[in-house]
């Protein structure tokens, strides 16, 4: 496929697919392109994008992390439990939330370290190591909540998780951060969810780390050719441990954001995101063989799936049909990567 049109289609198929989605759902889904519809896409996309970013780091090294969904659920429970305990101990709601977030992110690094040591030091296949870690984490999550969703979180958590950067009210104009007080029945427009901004900041840091630092270059080297990377002086064991810890950090952050948005903790909160996270990375141009992939591409893949999820729901399509669509998209992405790698991975 050396024809210019064929090359363009192979390299830009994801963008074209996104454009097709937007065109179809703008007609089939009532209100899809409205402010509310767009922000539903963004809300769904936050958890998905953070998990997909976690997967990007691992897939670039030639591995895969099957624990991120369980880690997300674990983080929702730990953050909710910590927040409630600190609040009951007499700390202010704001300080309770802040310390719970920091503590959860720190605790979340432990499963990532375990996976990294299993893969990097003991040479356990990544899918087995992370599946085992995920199972352990899920079991601990179930023990922590005893089959009941973790609650008793300060109400401020919900206010933070569902806040916006900008508000607009008739006669009041724009308001930054705080929702203006208006008379009953007056509609206030909300713009830019705060959790979307927080997600964008961390994803941006992840993109910089992977593409602009020596750490990122070493990750690509390990995924491209492990033996050559070792001969070049890279310590794969130590580096892979760090990569899986970063993956766990992003998964834990996703869980914290979920807790803030829904003010609860659930062991299975992230399970349904696992397949989508992997698919988003592949759609974004990453190779499951390692050495290729970008966070920017993952953002595009996550956006495609978030639009698909929202569009199908607004069009009244059954939930299970979404899984069929995601599976077909994954097959398409893998086939394009398999048969036209020299076209889609060649630098512009």
List each language-model region with its residue ranges:
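Cytosolic-side transmembrane-helix boundaries in multi-pass membrane proteins
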Residues: 1-23, 27, 231-238, 308-348
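Interfacial loop-to-helix junctions that mark the boundaries of transmembrane helices
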Residues: 4-11, 35-41, 91-102, 177-196, ...
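Hydrophobic core segments of alpha-helical transmembrane domains in multi-pass membrane transport
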Residues: 14-27, 55, 105-108, 134-142, ...
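Single transmembrane alpha-helix segments in multi-pass membrane proteins
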Residues: 23-89, 117-124, 228, 283-296, ...
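Alpha-helical transmembrane segments within multi-pass membrane transporters and channels
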Residues: 88-134
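Helix-loop-helix "hairpin" substructures at the membrane interface of multi-pass membrane proteins
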Residues: 97-104, 110-115, 175, 186-265
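Transmembrane helix-bundle core of multi-pass membrane transporters
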Residues: 126-212, 239-242, 262-270, 345-348
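Transmembrane alpha-helical segments in multi-pass inner-membrane proteins
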Residues: 244-252, 257, 261-327
């Amino acid at each position: 496929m050396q024809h210019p049109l064929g090359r363009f289609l192979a390299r830009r198929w994801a963008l074209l697919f996104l454009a097709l989605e937007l065109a179809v759902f703008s007609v089939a889904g009532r209100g899809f392109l409205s402010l509310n519809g767009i922000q539903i896409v963004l809300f769904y996309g936050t958890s998905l994008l953070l998990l997909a970013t976690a997967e990007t780091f691992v897939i670039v090294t030639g591995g895969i992390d099957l624990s991120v969904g369980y880690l997300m659920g674990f983080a929702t429970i730990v953050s909710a439990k910590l927040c409630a305990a600190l609040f009951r101990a007499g700390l202010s709601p704001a300080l309770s939330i802040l310390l719970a977030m920091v503590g959860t992110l720190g605790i979340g690094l432990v499963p990532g370290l375990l996976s990294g040591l299993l893969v990097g030091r003991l040479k356990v296949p990544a899918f087995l190591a992370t599946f085992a870690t995920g199972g352990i984490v899920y079991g601990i999550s179930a023990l922590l909540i005893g089959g009941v969703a973790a609650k008793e979180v300060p109400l401020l958590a919900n206010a933070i998780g569902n806040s916006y950067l900008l508000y607009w009210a008739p006669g009041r104009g724009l308001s930054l951060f705080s929702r203006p007080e208006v008379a009953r029945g007056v509609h206030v427009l909300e713009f830019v969810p705060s959790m979307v901004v927080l997600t964008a900041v961390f994803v941006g840091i992840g993109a910089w780390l992977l593409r602009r630092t020596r750490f990122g270059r070493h990750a690509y080297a390990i995924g491209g050719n492990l033996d050559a990377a070792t001969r070049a002086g890279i310590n794969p064991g130590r580096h892979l441990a760090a990569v899986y810890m970063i993956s766990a950090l992003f998964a834990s952050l996703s869980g914290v954001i979920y807790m803030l948005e829904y003010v609860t903790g659930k062991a299975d909160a992230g399970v349904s995101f696992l397949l989508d996270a992997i698919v988003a990375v592949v759609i974004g141009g990453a190779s499951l063989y390692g050495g290729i992939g970008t966070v920017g591409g993952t953002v595009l893949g996550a956006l495609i799936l978030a639009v698909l999820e929202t569009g199908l729901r607004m069009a009244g399509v059954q939930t299970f049909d979404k899984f069929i669509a995601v599976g077909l998209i994954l097959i398409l992405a893998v086939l394009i990567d398999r048969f036209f790698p020299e076209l889609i991975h060649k630098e512009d």
